[in-house]
Amino acid sequence: MVNTIKKSKGVFIMVEQDTIRLLRECDAGVKMGVSSIDDVLKYVKSERLRKDLTDNREEHCKLDKDLQELLDQYHDDGKDPNPMAKSMSWMKTNMKLVMNESDHTIADLITDGCNMGVKSLNKYLNEYKAADEKSKDICKRLINLEEDLTIQMRQFL
């Protein structure tokens, strides 16, 4: 009986740790996505591209609300994007747009960012297998948002 309780507690702790870790990575991903969209919006010329980006940004924000509720349940503050990754993204965005301020360039940058996000989120989904289903669902929803935006960007490439 004692071994079962210890094992059960160990499993519970593992689930909670993986859940929090996955939620943190999703939090950083949502923030990075919103920030990246914000960085390019002022350069957008096409109303269709502006609408696609704005709609996706709103979906990121809705998902962030659900994410913050789950993080609050675990008394966790979440995670900001890696400062180095964020500054490198900002530099790449601004350098490319200074050289070629076009919707094509914006679509290219957003596609690259989404692909990196999808890759990272799938890695974390595989790494934190013990995470609860709610956090896995949030992660999958974020992956779908990124994949959908990539598809929307194709017409501007």
Role assignments for model-derived ranges:
Residues 22, 36, 52, 87-91, ...:
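C-terminal ligand-sensing/allosteric alpha-helical core of TetR-family HTH transcriptional regulators
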Residues 14-44, 105-129:
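Alpha-helical bundle segments that constitute or directly flank the non-heme di-iron/ferroxidase center
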Residues 1-14:
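Short, Lys/Arg-enriched N-terminal segments with co-localized hydrophobic residues
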Residues 18-26, 47-65, 103-109, 134-145:
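Alpha-helical scaffold segments that form or flank carboxylate-/histidine-based iron centers
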Residues 34, 64-71, 92-95, 99, ...:
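A structural signal for well-ordered alpha-helices, especially hydrophobic packing surfaces
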Residues 65, 69-108, 112-118:
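Carboxylate-rich helix-loop segments that flank metal/cofactor sites and access channels
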